[in-house]
Regions:
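Extracellular polysaccharide-degrading/modifying enzymes targeting complex plant/algal/animal polysaccharides
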Residues: 1-273, 278, 285, 293
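Structural detector of coil-to-beta-strand junctions
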Residues: 14, 245, 268, 290-291, ...
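Right-handed parallel beta-helix
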Residues: 252-263, 275-289, 298-312, 325-341, ...
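Aromatic-anchored glycine-rich loop motif in surface-exposed flexible loops
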Residues: 293, 309-311, 317
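Short, solvent-exposed turn/loop segments enriched in Gly/Ser/Thr/Pro and often Arg
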Residues: 295, 349-355
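Catalytic cores of eukaryotic secretory-pathway lumenal/extracellular enzymes that build
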Residues: 316-317, 354
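Asp-box/WD-like beta-propeller blade repeats and closely related beta-sheet repeat scaffolds
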Residues: 319-321
């Protein structure tokens, strides 16, 4: 057993384990947190909340009365967190943006309305619907949104503008006289006639709930609405490292136990070509990729762990051979899997489960805006 003493380990490259680091059936190798101590492995050094100051002046007045006394701001360039950027994936089906956490609590990019349910979103009438790839138009009638004026170019629209299963993202221009929004990014499936659900991300005036953040792309300033239990010494982390945090390649009888693995633009733990390798009693959160990816595996998997807050699916598992029907005997069991698919909610699923004779059992799966299990 390799014991890791308590503390926060900030990585600047992938921690790699290979065939040489594995064990045997009689003598497996386990990397484990020291009993009674907390081990955090992260790709983000973090920034202290003391670097922020209360919002003031004109920017304070733009916020709702409840938010005015809570929102804080800092120059993002002074925080040492890395570059904050927004982009759209291929076909504009997925938003690519960083994930933030404050003392381990997930934060959410500000949005309006504040709900995952499309029933609560704004419902807008499309204009000149077009069934092919096009720049959709719709009429915005929400008086609150029409009253917002700050940095409209920062806004990102999310909508099921054609099909109820096909979410898309786009920027747009708003004609304030007519309320017509014209997308400046294409909708792959076009748009359909009728009332369609729309949500707006990264609008400053919508910053109105604890745990939300907004980035002013012109000034480079980051605004946050802290949780009630945070202090000046709280730590803000952002997914900034562009590498998988832990990789296990070609190993056998190697286990990871009792670790908290968090914050990367890539994946948390990646296992490939492994046998009898198990992740147990771990907490994995805040990844723009997946928290866990296990491929070409036998008798390997994840158990008794919590996996949450990923931009896409939380877990990928594949083992066994479809052609020969050779079983993988891999597993995901007794895990809590929640709040995944933060920015991709179509054809992804909370868990991607592949292979032959693998087991998904006794798991609690919730707060996922896509299918729970994709297999």
């Amino acid at each position: 057993t390799v014991y890791l003493r308590g503390g926060t380990y900030v990585l600047n490259k992938t921690f790699e384990l290979t065939e040489a680091d594995g064990g045997t059936e009689d003598l497996p190798v386990t990397w484990r947190a020291y009993p009674g101590e907390t081990v955090i492995i992260t790709g983000s050094a973090g920034a202290s909340l003391s670097a922020f100051e209360p919002v003031s002046g004109e920017m304070k007045e733009k916020l709702s009365p409840d938010a005015q006394e809570h929102v804080m701001v800092a120059d993002a360039r002074d925080l040492g967190l890395g570059e904050i950027s927004f982009s759209l994936s291929a076909l504009n089906l997925c938003l690519e943006a960083p994930l933030f956490s404050l003392d381990g609590q997930h934060m959410r990019l500000t949005r309006y309305p504040n709900s995952n349910s499309t029933e609560d979103w704004m419902h807008v009438e499309t204009v000149n619907p077009n069934s092919s790839t096009s720049y959709p138009e719709f009429k915005l009638t929400d008086e609150r949104v029409l009253g917002w004026s700050y940095q409209e170019s920062d806004w990102l629209y999310s909508s099921y503008i054609r099909y109820g299963w096909a979410q898309g993202y786009f920027h747009g221009t708003l004609n304030r006289e007519t309320g017509i929004v014209t997308a400046t990014d294409t909708a792959y499936y076009g748009s359909a006639a009728g009332q369609k659900p729309v949500q707006i991300y990264n609008a400053y005036e919508s910053l109105d709930e604890p745990g939300e953040w907004y980035y002013d792309q012109m000034s480079g300033r980051l605004y946050i609405y802290p949780f009630a239990d945070t202090t000046r010494n709280s730590t803000l982390r952002m997914t900034s490292s562009n590498f998988d945090l832990i990789s296990v390649n070609g190993a056998s009888y190697l286990n990871l136990e009792g670790l908290t693995v968090t914050s990367s633009k890539k994946d948390g733990i990646v296992m490939n070509n492994v046998d009898h390798c198990v992740i147990e009693n771990c907490t994995l959160t805040s990844f723009e990729g997946r928290a866990v990816s296990i491929d070409n595996a036998t008798y390997s998997g994840l158990k008794n762990s919590e996996v949450a807050y990923t931009s896409i699916s939380a877990i990928y598992l594949n083992g066994g051979d479809y052609q020969t029907m050779e079983p993988g005997y891999d597993f995901i069991t007794n895990c809590r899997i929640h709040d995944t698919n933060q920015y991709r909610t179509m054809n992804e699923g909370g868990v991607k489960f592949r292979g032959v004779k693998n087991t998904f059992s006794n798991n609690e799966v919730y707060n996922i805006t896509d299918m729970a299990l994709n297999f």
